[in-house]
Amino acid sequence: MAHLRDTGHNYQRPSATNGASQINGDVFFTPGQDPLNQLPVVHEASHDSAEKQDDPLCLENTRAQVQECIYSWQKSDGDDRCIFWLSGMAGTGKSTIARTVAHEFQRRKCLVASFFFSRGSGDSESASFLFTSLAKQLATRRDTATQATSSAHIALQDALREALRQDPDVIRKSRQEQWDKLIIRPLTCFSAKLQDVSTTTSAVLVIDALDECSNENDIKGIIRTMARQQLPHARLRIIITSRPETLVRLEFSDKRNILHSSLSLDDVPQHVIDADLARFLHSRFDAIRDHQEGLTQDWPGLHTLNILLRRCEGLFIYAETLCLYLEEDCQHSHSRLQTVLNKTTLQGKGHTTALDDMYLTVLINAFKNLSKLSESEKDRSKDLYDHVVGSIVVLQDDLSASTLSYLTQISQFDIMAILHRLRSVIKQSGIESPITLLHETFREFVSDQRRRKSYEGG
């Protein structure tokens, strides 16, 4: 199942408080307990969580213009617009950019907190613990503290503790109250302590894939809450990424303090995107050559690279899926690449994009030996695929293989065999590890009967 959030403090029945005192309603504190431990946290939603340690960052010298735009905005004293909206179609690399800038701001000693929404990932798709998670991260980040800012960080912690003592039920109250009491007031104290310190230190909140929040009212409410007022005294910068969905776009359109007009990844010149994609592919192809003898130094060649760049259609997720597909069986990388190159995207023939072609190629290759099976074995293999992949897509939760086995009554061996065949589009590292999709576009592909018809028909 999804990772259980760390509530730090349990709401207890009066009969089970073991001497704890009751403060304001039904929230109990044990004497000597740090109020910060009361804050519910979705650990896996943070950019530096264990679950995200293998997620990619931008390759050096790629997406440089977009990153520089963000960094320049963050350190500009003359720009009081505190929110930066980075939009782009699915697969354009928004989450990778968000992870990269979060790590870079942390390296620059900014106070960084992040929340990466993820559809189908339990607490990570809900906004219920967004502000409490961000507040806890701001209060407990120790790797960014310097001698000049340590007293300011202590002031932030003290302000947050005091807010929780004064109103322990704030974690159950409106998002506006949580925002004001858990984020803005502590950050205002943080900034006040820095007034006499010569530093450009600021707090940076990174909220990725807001459109993947499961509740549309929460999406609107989050934007309205954060954009309601100018925040010059909080030294706060907020980066939000999302697809350019109508709901999100309309919420941003009438907020003058939101910097977003020229920050769509879809507006980046094609030659810039292609240059970044070429660097990405060159780097990954170099690694493949290192693991497979017999490939020439210029493999796969400039002509092939240009074909692949056209197939990418500006989507980094296509390039990532292609490389994972080639890397999962390095001894057959060349033949797999030829299979991809020989496939022609057909408009209106059951799928419509090169990315669909890539997903179809992965599925067809995963089950290409079905022709050698008996009819009953073929039917069983297809049923296993339908039940395993269908459950992962429909249940929309980070299930482990053991939990999925319990729910579907399919053996762990069969589940792991299916997942192993699909490891270029489904991430899974062990029986008890969460199963996650490489990208939300694969869920959308599998869920669209028209787009997957070519595979099912074959």
Where are these regions (language model features)?
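Conserved NB-ARC/NACHT P-loop NTPase core of NLR-like innate immune receptors
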Residues: 2-458
